């Protein structure tokens, strides 16, 4: 699978315009709705521009691969977190790409450390959790906590899991362009 490396915000906008209306992995929202909800939640909590950008772009990897929308239902882990981080690394700093790269591990971490977190996951998120390795071992927990941006990844993960409501209205993508621009390398 070839990976698209983006070099500008206009390329990111183009990808959202071309693929953003695709299904968001078995949820009742599209990819763009999920991204906008995540970023809106981050903004509502006064997150930094970099973390708002990470919230907007955390699932960008789903938009740049050629797998079907239902890949997780077919037992396929698309490693979207790594794809997104790699695709965006030439235009954004680690403060954007590292929380993106860690947000899947953050779900595993939260399901291991918070007894109630697993019960908050949607069916689709439980399916992907199993593909992504399930809960963490003690060694994996300690390794996760050693990453510089692990706490940002946890915040991002919570917004990610809340951003699946088809009734929520958010600002348009254009609202978040200033956050993206201020986060550029």
Where in the sequence are the language-model features?
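Metal-dependent phosphohydrolase cores
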Residues: 1-185
